Amino acid sequence: MKRLGSVVLALVLTLTLLPGKVRAAGPEVAAKSAVLMDVETGTLLSEQNAHEPLAPASVTKVMTMLLIMEAIDSGKIGWEDTVTASEAAASKGGSQVYLKVGETMTVSDMVKSIAVSSANDCACAMAEHLAGSEAAFVEQMNTKAKELGMNDTNFVNCTGLDDDPQAASHRTSAYDIAIMSRELLKNHPDIKKYTTIWMDTVRGGAFGLSNTNKMVRFYDGCTGLKTGFTSGAGYCLSASAQREGLELIAVVMGSENSKDRFAACKSLLDYGFANFSLYTPALQEGASVPVKLGTAESVAAVPGGAVSLLVDKAQRGSLTAEIELAESVTAPVSRGQRLGTLTVKAGDQVISQVPLVAEREVVRLNILDLWKILLRRIAMAK
């Protein structure tokens, strides 16, 4: 192996400065629980009773939207498919667009109504459309929660309504809300086309929608995500925002009033943007390995996967990366074959090591090609 030297980190890395750790507590906010999480890496940047199971109200619909987006992105359903409202959907209380039994609406307008106006009737209609019944859909919600490691969560319905005795066990935590919010934003970014709408209409302009998340209008870079309120849950919010490539999720549960929940999320997001950065530099040009007996003389070495480095701004100047590559490699070389290592450091502390792999395949020269090369070298030696 050969060392190519230290370079200032300028590579899109998916690492965290303190992997698996929570930074020192951020601002204390007026809520029963709260968290601040980085979307790219999943790093928890601030917490306040993060794992306390509480009623989430309509923030539940983050999971509802996640399952809808999975169905759309997998091709199971399309944006222009029509959804028919059942009696169960039309009879949902709380926030709604007042669907009538038998009324049809496109998936796009259903999602818009859920994301912007927190429409319970549309959430139920989509649940039935995807799973056959709300109960079956709730099973899928809980299955997905387990897959994501949401260990504080038990869903009873797809809306977050707590007017049913069974809803007493409908619980999740601020941490789990951040987990599902991150999954939605990171892997299904098209949802932002809806969660960033301030005002819009459905039914051909006949019914107006106004976003319940006022941060969409008043917080710079806001990308969503979902409000919630019931008398039992209090005021809840999962708020996301992106600035200079860094996207954060702030979750608060159990605030006493709407003003407090927005102020709490603003405080958390402000703290995150003031103290953290996401680095995306490019690997030093010429990071390649010579290839013996190959159809190409060398192969470029690239990171073995998408990577991002979340750092404390106070340590920004101390970040370096050391690249170590093989002296050479013999063909055939497969795409993704390991060629070396990129070691990321903050001062003398090793933060993480990333494999460097072959960017493309290099085929081995055939016998005829080898003979031609040999004869050429003999001729040049005369």
Please tell me what each predicted stretch does.
Residues 150-151, 168-382:
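Domain-terminus/edge residues, biased toward the C-terminal soluble/receptor-binding domains
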Residues 15-16, 74, 283:
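Residues in and immediately flanking transmembrane alpha helices
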Residues 1-5, 56, 107, 367, ...:
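Structural motif marking the loop-to-transmembrane transition
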